[in-house]
Amino acid sequence: MSGPILVFDSGVGGLSILDEIRRVLPDQNYCYLFDNARLPYGELEEQELIDGCEALITATVAQLGASLVVIACNTASTLVLPVLREALTIPVVGVVPAIKPAALYSQAKHIGLLATPGTIKRSYTHSLIQEFAANCQVELYGSSELVLLAERKASGKQILQGEIAQLLSPIKVSGIDTLVLGCTHFPILKDEIQQYLGDGVLLLDSGKAVAARVSTLIKEESTLNKRQRKGHSKEMIALYTSEVGEGLKKLLAEFGFSTYSKAQTG
């Protein structure tokens, strides 16, 4: 395997995952593919999501010769992983909500899961709760609006604390001491969420766990060349399915992307 690592999401949320991966694998080539034409994924019908993701990702893997795929989207991971693993011959890594560590860290054994409505309703999510948090009271909060707020912030627009409060007020009064950010968009708003909920609520996401898994797979395949220059990846490509504004292009440039263009969708 010598091609780029392909990181996929519906929008810019997966950049939080890519950031963690680059910390442990700074010398790899990366492609960030985001399907912003169909954002937010939490509102899509299951089969529409599966078919669209499979077509887009497999086409991009073939085009770039990608070495590994990261589905940096909780909603897509709950549905698309089995299909992609059957269709592709390279490793495919998904994102799992950090329910297990939340159950371990929670002192009150009262935790919350904040995710898209799609992730909240999946049987996979409820199986995780039964397996890893059976000893906890678990509150479920679904929000697509928070995804769009994260996209706004990423494009350079201001997010008002009142907007956060309007969406998260049920969480603030719930009494939880640990909140799982079960959508990769939500770490973009981590500072705003923490400020609103207060220091008494621990926020957890899956970024570091995904990065560790990717690092293990890459090293197992002996693709990490330790003689490469340290501190910067060699190539950063961004592909999108719908045109992006100047604010988002600026963010991509600041993130280190040298090339960004529309993905080939068929």
Swiss-Prot record:
Provides the (R)-glutamate required for cell wall biosynthesis. It catalyses: L-glutamate = D-glutamate. InterPro entries: Asp/Glu/hydantoin_racemase (IPR015942), Asp/Glu_race (IPR001920), Asp/Glu_racemase_AS_1 (IPR018187), Asp/Glu_racemase_AS_2 (IPR033134), Glu_race (IPR004391). This is Glutamate racemase. The active site is at C73 (proton donor/acceptor), C183 (proton donor/acceptor). Pathway: Cell wall biogenesis; peptidoglycan biosynthesis. GO terms for molecular function: glutamate racemase activity. Its EC number is 5.1.1.3. The gene is murI. It comes from Shewanella woodyi (strain ATCC 51908 / MS32).
